Amino acid sequence: MPRITLSCQLLSTPSLASDRIFEPILRPVMPELNTLRGIAVLMVLVYHAFYWSIDLSMFAPAKRLFLTAAWTGRLGVNLFFVLSGFLITGLLVDTKTRQDYYKRFYIRRSLRILPAFLLTLVVLLAVRAAPLNFVLLSAAYLANLTPLFGVAIAYPVLWSLAVEEHFYLVWPAVVRRLSNRAIAAVCVSIVALSPITRLISFFVARRKGWVSYEIFDYTWNSADGLACGALLAIFLRECRPSRKTIARLTGLLVVLAIVIWTVGLPFGIFSRHLPVGAALQIVPWNFGFVALIGFSLLLGSSPRRRWSRSPVLEFFGDISYGLYLYHLLILNGLGWLDYHGFFANLHFPLFLGLWIRFGLLLGLSVLAAYLSGRYLEQPILHLKDRWT
């Protein structure tokens, strides 16, 4: 592990008197991050509705351009990773001296995650949307590694939950045992090594004839987003930077992301089917998402905080977990109805049909997530105060 010290003195400027009229950057409740959750989950829905399994050759060039742009929606998962790394690391650092540190964390995480997750697995089995071996591996938090067991990923959204669970299993011990600066060193190591592991995985997959995109689901190839978010959480707590310093950092990260894209463009950085893209494609996005979180925190703690908050997006953020889990089941259900002729008498242009399908997907997914949250998840989550 490389030796590292947080260069707080180099990065920081003295806190200005004007900083005092703002709220603290880190607060018990940060609604602006819920807005980002809402954006992230809507990105994923747009990706699945307009790009995933769509034959782009069937559309005119202008419409094809829009559908191609919908590809970026899959990056909503990476935004979730950076957010999770930031929030979970902050939570763990702030509570690491508690005697009930492990008990409190794992009970609360279990109450939050398991109800909707287990319901999803039951529904997958009930409607025969996934084979038993995939469901069992998913229940063991191995949904992202099922290809290593010779089992296809039958319900793709579960891969990212597996990555998150692996993070939850390992990270509390790391935070508990190490100093903040040592945690930062771990994060920097992960960010530095992840492109190398992706590149190695890319060549191994190509040599063995595996489906190349599945390698990006493996935990060791996705951990740098979590590490980037964790590094921001440590930086804000260890260095206590001024608002001006945070603004400079966000700007620096955006510039760095643009430089990586510019330099990598001739080498295929936007294609995961090429070595440079496989290794580095997600890196500038991770930097950009860290900058986005930093900017949101600045705006959310300023007198103009209302600009960082959207009631609609916060609502989507509140139900983002259920939306993410259930939406693909609903999309597959709409596909099943279409295949069996339920929409045979509806004659819409193909592109308009995609928008109608998206409207149905969004409405039904919101309904399912809201009902799940109100009648399943929240009643169980209320047990956390009794059990911890």
Regions found by a protein language model. Give the residues of each.
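Alpha-helical transmembrane segments in multi-pass integral membrane proteins
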Residues: 4-32, 42-71, 88-100, 126, ...
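Short alpha-helical catalytic segment bearing the HExxH-like zincin motif
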Residues: 34, 105, 157-162, 324
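Residues within membrane-spanning alpha-helices of integral membrane proteins
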Residues: 34, 38-41, 77, 84, ...
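Hydrophobic, aromatic-rich transmembrane alpha-helices
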Residues: 121, 168-177, 181-192
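Short helix- or helix-capping micro-motifs
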Residues: 137-142
